Amino acid sequence: MHRLILRFFATAFLVLLIFAARARAEDEVRIQEEIWALPLALPMFAYLVRPVGDGPFPLVIMNHGVSLKPTDRSFFPLVEFRDAAKWFARRGYLVVAPVGSGYGAQAIDIPERALYGPFFSKVGKCTNPNFHDAGLAVAQVDLRIIDYMAAEKRIIPDDVIVVGQSAGGWASIALSSLNPPPVKAIIAFAAGRGGRVDGKPNNNCAPDRLVEATADFGRTSRVPMLWIYIENDTFFGPALSQRMHAAFISAGGRAEYHLMPPFGNEGHFFIGSPDAIPLWSPLVTKFLDAQK
């Protein structure tokens, strides 16, 4: 018995050493941060971070959320999800975090002067929202980014992960319905559309229609997905996100669902905090390892 106990602790200690060595190796990877202008049909800036070296590397695309007001979009940061993106880069990925069309300098909507920026992911009025096309619009941008980065010989064309938050997560779910061959897996944080109508917590735009649209995407989606939501998300609360997941799975989609404990004052922006990385990274690591 004494020998068995010693063997158990020796094995456990060895496993801990392996994980510690892996963590140190990942943290010591040198990375390089850049700002790119992507010459797509609708040109856009992107934050890019990658390991130092020529590559090619597996690709991660990170889709941000939506701001409906032009003023808010005009102040949108050029670098979004920096800490999360660097986490992926230290694990060998080239990460592209595009700033959507209609954000930053392109947020020029002045209706009284008949000036409108190229913001194309509105869902319309809550009486008849079009969640479906709003998601697919951003999904098409992801496909163009994959094509462009592959043509530049910077990435491994058949090794792409797509990550999205909020409306960007919704676009990632939409992308999964297209089953693009290069995309191996998709990770959605706090995904959805139509949250906090009029700025009111847990006040959603046509939630039944959102669930229906989720099921519609699930009918054709076969890409492995990881969905992460947070208990104190006032945009897409647990009851709604669980309904969405159930509808998606019942329709045929493949998605692993996790509801995380409350985080800060508002869980919706979980992925944007460096303090959240130790909480979500084990789930993401396990999920991505399972796709290899």
Residue ranges and their predicted role:
Residues 140-210:
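Primarily recognizes the serine-hydrolase "nucleophile elbow" in alpha/beta-hydrolase
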Residues 55-57, 65-107, 237:
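Short substrate-entry loop that stabilizes the transition state in hydrolases
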Residues 113-153:
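Alpha/beta-hydrolase active-site loop
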Residues 63, 98-100, 189, 260:
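Alpha/beta-hydrolase
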Residues 185, 191-251, 256:
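The feature captures the conserved acid-bearing segment of alpha/beta-hydrolase catalytic domains
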Residues 26-55:
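N-terminal cap/lid segment of alpha/beta-hydrolase-fold proteins
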Residues 63-65, 229:
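The conserved beta1-alpha1 loop
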Residues 242, 251-292:
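C-terminal catalytic histidine-bearing segment of alpha/beta-hydrolase fold enzymes
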